[in-house]
Amino acid sequence: MQNYNVIQKILHDLCFKFKIINNSLYEIEKLIYFRNINPIDTKHQKHIFISGLPRSGTTTLLNYIYQNDEFASLKYKNMPFIFSVNLTSKINIQKNFKPKLRPHNDKIFFSLDSPEAFDEVFLNSINYENSEEEFIKYVSLILKYYKKKKYLSKNNNNCKRIDFLKKTFPNAKFLIPFRNPLQQSLSLMNQDINFSKIHSNDKFVLRYMNFLGHNEFGINHKPWFKPKLYYDRNDINYWIEQWVEFYSYYFNLYNKEKQSCKFICYEKLIDTSYQEELSKFLETNLSNKKQFDISFKPHPKKYDNDLFQTAIELYEKLNNLI
């Protein structure tokens, strides 16, 4: 996005500002391409939805599962026409795009064929709680374009929609990654600083992130839960508190939903037996025994010990789920 030329930025801005463009293309897409699609088949497939607090390994997990070549996901090449992947498949405005290190500067590269969290835009455009059939149609059209039967989504906002998604796709699997609370909180704080600088220097990136519903960090940051004790985002305690609020909430909701929801420990992904356990849960063959690069960085020495102890106890609870 930071390397888009003027024409690319104008086209994206038009789609960002005038929702009627993508909405109209979607209606045409359905008229032409939804024929001969069986939505019942899509509804009952074992799709996978990855959703958690950012910096928990969601993208690494997405790429790991996607390499299995069994799933369809929206990709960077589908931007900005993500409502009409079949209809606009011949439009290529991002030629000569070589793999680049993503703005997070976290050793993860992306290309036009990299999967990414773009279904948030569609879900934000509809009253999704009453639109099960519409989302099934949307996913069906993506599956048609990529000639796959199962959909793979990484969207950190989907945690708040798990009940809707379970109702829409009753056989779907949900992965909620988590990470050592101090390491994850430090990473969140560092990315907030990083993206605040990027947003200040490049307003197009800010508009792009707002369009995609990426409000995790930067100038457009929105807390996942209302802060109780800590309000300063430059204080590690703000992020630890958000970590505790986030995982406490979803642990209480889904820790007993063991057939459909699984909390995934980032640090354990280096263990091949843990990968095999994940493969069994997803009922798929994750044959690529990826060597995960689990990073640990020095953390601030000063933090709220009571808050941190609460976080560690919750981390252990999540780890002990079978």
Model-predicted regions and their roles:
Residues M1-D41, S196-I322:
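PAPS-dependent sulfotransferases, especially Golgi type II membrane carbohydrate sulfotransferases
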Residues H44-H47:
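Pre-Walker A (Motif I) flank of P-loop NTPase domains
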Residues I50:
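Hydrophobic anchor at the beta1->P-loop junction of P-loop NTPases
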Residues L53:
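P-loop (Walker A) phosphate-binding loop of NTP-binding proteins
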Residues T59-A72:
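A conserved segment at the C-terminal end of the G1
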Residues K77-L152, E216, N220-F225:
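PAPS-dependent sulfation machinery
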Residues K154-N156, L165-N190:
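Conserved phosphate-donor/acceptor-positioning beta-strand/loop module used by diverse small-molecule
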Residues R161-T168, E277:
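A short acidic, amphipathic alpha-helical/loop segment
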